[in-house]
Amino acid sequence: MSVATASPAIRPVEGIGCLLASMVFFASQDAMMKFLLEEYPVWMLIGVRGMISTAILLPLIIWVSGARSLATPLWPLHLLRAVLFAMGFSLFYAAFPFMGFAEVVTIFFSAPLMTAIFAALFLRETIGPYRGGALIVGFIGILIAIRPGADTFQWVAILPLICAVTYALSQIVARQIGERDSTLVVGLYTLAPSVFIVAVMGWGLNAVIDLGPEYKHLRFAYPMPSAETLPWLIVTGVVGMFAYLLISRAYQIAPASLMAPFDYTYLPIAAVLGYVLWGEVPPLATFVGMTLIIASGVFIGYREIVTARRAKAVHIAPTAPYVADVPHREDGV
């Protein structure tokens, strides 16, 4: 897909900071979603989050930069990203009632590995033999966590894996959008359409499949929130909005292959939340898979930094007789 976009500035330090903050917000949001799924369908929760985000972002954008900033020639990319997000995270949350919190997110965190692969395929970001080997190790960790063929295998484990694919693709789309549109606009066009996208998904699923009582969180229904849960719905929407804004910003201003490994900070947060909130102790296979996935991601990030420094040195050497005279980028790695 070829789209004329403004070339985004590369600011890795700011990008990493935004991504780490987004992981904290995402973990908090997902924990609240797991609780709310006991009473409300996933379509309603994602739809409410989209409505709350729209109610906040739309007037904020108009106030900050004017209504004209909403106009964009990149609307096909924004719509594609919205579909990927809504579809992927509907499947992600659908797995929560059947699996432990840490188990679901461990499988989902094949996404950074897939992001690195998609970045090589679509953005021509290089993956050398070292990082290629690390990707293989990471995917072995995913297989261990999913445990296909084992007696404990659950088909719902495929749902967060599909979400990982859509998430990785959405970050590649974000990089294509670059900084042509502001982070607020990107967030609005990702979250606002989700209200309608998940409604169509929920209606379609229930139209073709007669869901049993164990799938009540997938029924197409929008019950009136109780006084006790309404504040949590609002807080979840606000926290989710900030999470998406931060992660959109991160992938706009830094290479996808550099950002991807820092997504793994979510995993230890999820393990702690799962134990504290639900008393969950993931099986050994989940811990082994998680360890391999994290090790793979950290090594990929390390190789990215090494490669960037070598490329910078090669670029500087032929043009500067004295290293001291060479200007350095303040945001370089």
Language-model features, listed with the residues they occupy:
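Loop-to-transmembrane-helix transition segments
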Residues: 14-20, 67-91, 155-161, 212-242
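C-terminal-most transmembrane helix of multi-pass membrane proteins
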Residues: 2, 268-333
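Helix-helix packing/entry segments at the starts of transmembrane helices
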Residues: 105-110, 177-193, 241-275
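Transmembrane alpha-helical segments that form core, pore/gating elements
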Residues: 152-214, 223, 311-333
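C-terminal transmembrane-helix exit sites in multi-pass transporters
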Residues: 111-136, 268-287
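Hydrophobic/aromatic residues within transmembrane alpha-helices
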Residues: 36, 45, 49, 95, ...
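Hydrophobic transmembrane alpha-helices of multi-pass small-molecule transport proteins
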Residues: 130-147, 163, 285-304
